[in-house]
Amino acid sequence: MLITTEGFILKNRKFGETDSILTIFTRKAGKITAIAKGARRPKSNLLAGIQPFCYSEFVLYKGKNMYTVSQCEAKEIFYPLREDLKRLSYASYLVELVEAVTTEGQTNHRLFNLFGKTLFLLKKSDIEINPIVRAFEIKLMNYLGYKPQLMSCVNCDSKETTAWKFSATEGGLLCSSCYSADLFAMKISNTAVKLAIFLLMKDITEVQKLKISDHLNEELKKILKQYILTHTNKYDFKSLEVAEKL
Ligand SMILES: [Zn+2]
């Protein structure tokens, strides 16, 4: 069976003399593994479209265990990401995160669109990286089915509290009367709650110029990291740490 779909290259590994094994996040088939035969021959017409991050149009043959790339045409190679180590590292973080949280063969159109928009944003020079990355993380959780409850207490629905905490296991805010519902809940400031709501509601292209303090970014980053870890249990955040040191 042949399918035609757009997709992003998440991973590209050498295989044998001239082949490549690809992990592709496709629009129509979700995350898939595909072999690109002869792709590493200098004159291969697959070569351009299968580099990491590449957004390409693929014609894929679905075999028993794996797809085979029969044609591919690069639509966007994200060149600016490749020449700037900082952007490259953040893009690698997003790629790893998507790879870790998606299931082979399961489509997720909202995540696919978000991933594409975010890579296109990271290509631009006049952007604020931190709000973009935080927005990506919180939207990713939403699209995986873990939309955090940020308007009221997740335990008693109260909108009033002396101070909020965020419970990763309960998936939202806890008011001061409900702290005992999760002993590992983390303090969260009112400003961070407002920022999280903003990032969740707005399209990611609308947060590209948003200025947030390092302090606020750190606060939300810690909470989202805990939230992602609790529900995906697969990701170690090493590439994010590398990106932040640059
Ligand atoms: Zn409560």
Curated annotation (Swiss-Prot):
Gene3D superfamilies: Nucleic acid-binding proteins, Recombination protein O, C-terminal domain. Involved in DNA repair and RecF pathway recombination. It comes from Alkaliphilus oremlandii (strain OhILAs) (Clostridium oremlandii (strain OhILAs)). Belongs to the RecO family. It comes from the Bacteria. This is DNA repair protein RecO. NCBIfam families: reco. The lineage of its organism: Bacteria, Bacillati, Bacillota, Clostridia, Peptostreptococcales. Keywords: DNA damage, DNA recombination, DNA repair. PANTHER family: DNA REPAIR PROTEIN RECO (PTHR33991:SF1). InterPro entries: ARFGAP/RecO, DNA_rep/recomb_RecO_N, NA-bd_OB-fold, RecO, RecO_C. Coiled coil: none annotated. GO terms for cellular component: bacterial nucleoid. GO terms for biological process: DNA recombination; double-strand break repair.
